[in-house]
């Protein structure tokens, strides 16, 4: 067993938990790209990106060179320090080149799901003030009008329709022409959108210092919490527009010199084939993928013995599912991490993944990352709680977000005066420093790891002339974890049906935000201040009497 450090301290009455691993030196002064490529001379000729779609392999030297060329290309199109580009792409090498290229300029990348509806994409492009959108030709229709009306350039990674540029125009630049920029540690580099603990999606400002710290907390140090090395092959099937994949797969992989195997979307047979073919050693997944592996009859036909780490995040993984999937990966350590976009995103990581591993319990989602502090507080009083008592999980450290873009009020609600980020998740820390999540204070629905903000769907429902009031809450689902369901009050005399409500929503939102059930009610329960009492509605669902 590795050496442990003191994990519990008292500060001004607060009980504060720290990692069992000692703090490490983190080069927080480095821009993100410099940090990720800091040790490139040790593995410049090794594979960096493997494109699962066509087996094309890019070495570290080729990737770093292409990122610098793209930086110059973006600059020639007018992108300067602190400008924003939107990456509207599925997993692809170009996603990596665009994100890292923007970092070299001190520019910001906002990442959006290419399956968003046109309205959802445009909303994010507007809110983030994106000056360039990098996408595929099949998604151009979603942004075409907005781009032409707002002088936003659209770049396609495949055949470019009229009025769009081709990505090759970026990669043909002279890499030596990168403008000299002085990037400050607190400058924003990534702008993912998250609903936070309540409300509508907001831009989460993640800085160079924040992402460098978060990656270092996972993979740096003598005894790295998430042990990876240059011989590893990481499966990148989770979407890079999601911070879990961007941080714990791409950035961590680049830092250690591992090969990153890019897969556009999850499909069980090709997924298993790629693991076998490229001898994937690290599998960062989400519960729906774990469920598919546990239940698929074809898994036993493939050799998965190369996998040594199976990590699940983005939503809690049940103990039964954890046990079921263990049998499919004979040589793998299986465990969970816990993250939240605003926290950079990793708060806790399973110590079975450490270079010198610790024993862990099934169902735990790790222990707090090093160089950070965690406390559990009573949601009503704000007082910190001792071990084994559930309360709101709070985290403090250099890895957390700078704040929400143009939303100081939401920032103040999430990060308090002492620098603690309040997650809105309820959990407890046991006598072995392991964190268990038990409930969610926040309103967010997690569909297969994707965020659904009830307020967003409720606003759309209230636009319907035959609906006078509505509330959206999560309903448990074996496949998806949670699905959104709506409680709807019909307008006077209206006979609107469940199917009509579902169709009305499905035309306006991406698939995972679609309402799966509609329950018609006389009234939506509310507090005296008018806040929807979601707990009451969730209790009705649990009791099997929604109406």
Swiss-Prot record:
Q: Which UniProt keywords apply?
A: ATP-binding, Ligase, Magnesium, Nucleotide-binding, Phenylpropanoid metabolism
The record's annotation in SUPFAM superfamilies points to: Acetyl-CoA synthetase-like
Q: Which cofactor does it need?
A: Mg(2+)
Which Enzyme Commission number(s) are listed?
A: 6.2.1.12
One GO term in the molecular function aspect is: 4-coumarate-CoA ligase activity
Per the record, which residues fall in region SBD1? 267-336
One Pfam family for this entry, by name?
AMP-binding
Q: Which reaction does it catalyse?
A: (E)-4-coumarate + ATP + CoA = (E)-4-coumaroyl-CoA + AMP + diphosphate; (E)-4-coumarate + ATP + H(+) = (E)-4-coumaroyl-AMP + diphosphate; (E)-4-coumaroyl-AMP + CoA = (E)-4-coumaroyl-CoA + AMP + H(+)
Enumerate the residue ranges of region (SBD2).
Answer: 337-404
Its function, per the record, reads:
Carboxylate--CoA ligase that may use 4-coumarate as substrate. Follows a two-step reaction mechanism, wherein the carboxylate substrate first undergoes adenylation by ATP, followed by a thioesterification in the presence of CoA to yield the final CoA thioester.
Q: In the UniProt entry, what is the domain comment?
A: Both substrate-binding domains (SBD1 and SBD2) are involved in the substrate recognition, and are sufficient to confer the substrate specificity.
Family designation = Belongs to the ATP-dependent AMP-binding enzyme family.
Q: What is the official name of this protein in its record?
A: 4-coumarate--CoA ligase 1
**Which gene name belongs to this protein?**
4CL1
